[in-house]
């Protein structure tokens, strides 16, 4: 059997080279140049086109090259005989932590304000805050979220974490479910979203939620664009309740040039770069899962189709 690489808007070349290096006896093919669709039982995917996996009748394992799998589950009909695997790697988690720490520091030390003042040659000091002054609340404390929460707590931030189900994380006050959401939001200075996309979490970040963050608070979205009601964020920012937001993910990517988010003075935009898969690190997991698949052994980091993560 062979491995198929099925990517949209991502070059497969380095992946092909890396997999061939680690699996020299395995044929690695790139869609649409597949010799025999019946021979493919393992696919490496990034944003596969709508319904495309149905072309592979013997496909057993669908492996994401990112931590999220919604880019697969939203466009494909997954069979009960198929297993979806996500990519979990400490490098990915650490990259996310570093990005979020930089984003928090930019906000509490007023670096963007000073950059704006520089344009007008305005020499004016701003009041800053320290780590111990700030409560950071994290929506989504799975593998990456829990890693980030522990790291930030170790630096002295007051950290809260929320998930659909209760989690225990060292140094973190944790909350779960709808009943504890308001308690989780109470006292929040910086709200960070790292949730997976599920029917329960789509549009969860709305006017009602953002209005419960402390006045002058800040919002960072590194989860998915589907979590955020963009119009509500703009309204809360315009009201003055929130001081700003940093958005790394969007419902439509790339973000359309005419989108109002581009021109909002209180919104910082980054092009989905908070943490990027390291191919060498990812290859070890893919190779291990492929070999486990061939040998009938359990696969790592499989998706629960009922939970969606």
Which sequence ranges carry the predicted segments?
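NAD(P)-binding Rossmann-fold cofactor-contacting core
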Residues: 155-171
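Phosphate/diphosphate ligand-binding glycine-rich loop within oxidoreductases
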Residues: 41-115
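Redox-cofactor binding/interface segments in oxidoreductases and associated redox assembly factors
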Residues: 44-45, 64, 192-193, 221, ...
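Rossmann-like adenosine-cofactor binding region
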Residues: 166-260
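Glycine-rich NAD(P)-binding loop of Rossmann-like domains
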Residues: 114-147
């Amino acid at each position: 059997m062979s491995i198929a690489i099925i990517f949209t808007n991502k070059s497969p070349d380095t992946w092909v080279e890396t997999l061939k290096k680690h699996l020299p006896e395995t044929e690695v093919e790139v869609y649409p140049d597949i010799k025999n669709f019946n021979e493919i039982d393992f696919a490496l995917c990034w944003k596969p086109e709508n319904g495309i996996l149905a072309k592979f009748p013997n496909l057993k394992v669908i492996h994401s090259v990112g931590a999220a799998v919604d880019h697969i589950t939203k466009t494909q009909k997954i069979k009960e005989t198929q297993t979806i695997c996500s990519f979990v790697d400490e490098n990915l988690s650490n990259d996310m932590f570093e990005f979020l720490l930089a984003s928090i520091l930019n906000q509490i030390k007023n670096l963007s304000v000073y950059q704006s003042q520089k344009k007008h040659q305005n020499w004016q000091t701003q009041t800053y805050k320290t780590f111990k002054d700030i409560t950071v609340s994290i929506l989504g404390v799975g593998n990456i979220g829990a890693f980030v929460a522990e790291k930030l707590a170790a630096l002295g931030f007051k950290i809260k974490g929320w998930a659909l189900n209760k989690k225990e994380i060292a140094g973190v006050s944790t909350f779960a479910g709808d009943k504890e959401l308001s308690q989780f939001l109470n006292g929040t200075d910086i709200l960070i979203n790292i949730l997976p996309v599920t029917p329960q979490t789509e549009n969860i970040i709305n006017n009602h939620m953002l209005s419960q963050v402390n006045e002058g608070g800040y919002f960072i979205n590194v989860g998915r664009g589907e979590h955020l009601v963009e119009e509500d964020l703009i309204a809360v920012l315009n009201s003055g309740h929130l001081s700003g937001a940093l958005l790394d993910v969007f419902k439509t990517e790339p973000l359309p040039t005419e989108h109002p988010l581009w021109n909002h003075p209180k919104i910082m935009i980054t092009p989905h770069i908070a943490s990027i898969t390291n191919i060498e690190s990812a290859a070890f997991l893919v190779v291990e899962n492929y070999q486990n698949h061939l040998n009938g052994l359990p696969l790592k980091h499989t998706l629960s189709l009922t939970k969606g993560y």
